[in-house]
């Protein structure tokens, strides 16, 4: 909104700063952070009053988690509100990428909200059926993919290799939707410990802020040999909003958590990262930067497949973070070590920009 107003006024005087994406990226991060810190306590109190028992805690999970009973969930609402308000304020709202990513964020957030609401209402950890949830997710992702792909080509670019791209044609629409849905659910599976999911999301968003900015610049993209995506620079501002809102949420989610983001937040943030990766044409890089989320999702897939096939478990408990808890690692040790892994993976992802 401010960008359009400043443009209408001719970017006169101090308004000229708003012309630059780098300035708006920093301003968006700070705005989302401040909004989140201001509304956080009110949101948490409201959720605590309305939910009563809070998020249901599984009896068959780690026994240390039983102490978390009564902690409110749906904290993802404050993330989404902080993110959306800061974006409306600072982004160029004419960008189709903005609306596609916003559609995924809000749409997936709504799906997660319905899932959380069902869990809280029924005091059960099951929520909405997986088939119904996936159907709704693919519907939202399909719409967003259509908007995004109308602005970019349908080639899949391979990192670490010069001038190597795979033409997917119409199948790219399906591929894009799978990336978005997969990212949303991978982050959702990672969100099982205080602070575990939100910091890797912040790290991934920071990494993609750099990638999106570079992809949006003709000079940098040509120098690095990465696909140039006109208008992708605005996605750096979207990433900054995720970072700011995420940091504000972490303030309240730090152990012991005062609130859980729930499926409302994890699906929204994961889906947003997937949409940003598709729009910036760095889908494979997302699998590297978000490798922790991939690892968590694979641990569940492997556990379920192997148990159905043999009746035995590969891990003591899935997702994998619970396996390490069962090995005797404290929750804080699991969380911090997984954060370290996320930082290393982010650096590896950035290395793909130059290593050919």
From Swiss-Prot:
The chain crosses the membrane at residues 27-47, 73-93, 97-117, 138-158, 165-185, 195-215, 232-252, 258-278, 284-304, 333-353. It is a multi-pass membrane protein. Its main location: membrane. Its EC number is 2.7.8.13. Keywords: Cell cycle, Cell division, Cell inner membrane, Cell membrane, Cell shape, Cell wall biogenesis/degradation, Magnesium, Membrane, Metal-binding, Peptidoglycan synthesis, Transferase, Transmembrane, Transmembrane helix. It is found in: Cell inner membrane. GO terms for cellular component: plasma membrane. GO terms for molecular function: metal ion binding; phospho-N-acetylmuramoyl-pentapeptide-transferase activity; UDP-N-acetylmuramoyl-L-alanyl-D-glutamyl-meso-2,6-diaminopimelyl-D-alanyl-D-alanine:undecaprenyl-phosphate transferase activity. Pathway: Cell wall biogenesis; peptidoglycan biosynthesis. It comes from the Bacteria. Pfam families: Glycos_transf_4, MraY_sig1. Its cofactor is Mg(2+). This is Phospho-N-acetylmuramoyl-pentapeptide-transferase.
